[in-house]
Amino acid sequence: PNGCPRRRGRQTYTRFQTLELEKEFHFNHYLTRRRRIEIAHALCLTERQIKIWFQNRRMKLKKELRAVKEINEQARREREEQDRLKQQQEKKLEQQQQQQQQQQQQQQQQQQQQAPPQQPPQQHHTISHHLHDQHKLGLEKAPPGADLLKAVAKVPT
């Protein structure tokens, strides 16, 4: 009414138009004027409609990429937090194991201090006595695999 052209309503595109525009966008996010004219004629749309569709599609892509980036950042932060918690748990477990080892060592030291010193058992036999015992039993000349029961039977009781 006041000399300004009336704004058109929202343009709805057919499935075919949308598919063709998406295919073109897949290869080129920006169009030359010549290509815009070709697409407009092929799809029975105006150059302005093609230009606006591509602007909107670039904004949609930008928004999607921002959302993906945010999801990845959130996943990275969660992963870092999980790693940090895992390291804390491992450190705590390691400290507990060290404390247990120290306690065991202290207990062993206390037990050793409280227990009377043990002397190793004394051996009264000498090699010559051992050889004498073998001679007495007749073992020194026994062929390999000889019946040991015979030798045991000769042991004085």
Curated annotation (Swiss-Prot):
Does the keyword DNA-binding belong to this entry? Answer: yes
Give residue spans, biased composition: Low complexity.
95-116
GO process annotations (BP): anterior/posterior pattern specification; negative regulation of transcription by RNA polymerase II
The biased composition feature labelled Basic and acidic residues covers: 73-94, 130-139
Which positions, given as ranges, span the membrane? Answer: none
Q: Which UniProt keywords apply?
A: Developmental protein, DNA-binding, Homeobox, Nucleus
Recorded protein name is Homeobox protein abdominal-A homolog
Question: What organism does the UniProt record list as the source?
Answer: Schistocerca gregaria
Q: Report which gene this protein is encoded by.
A: ABD-A
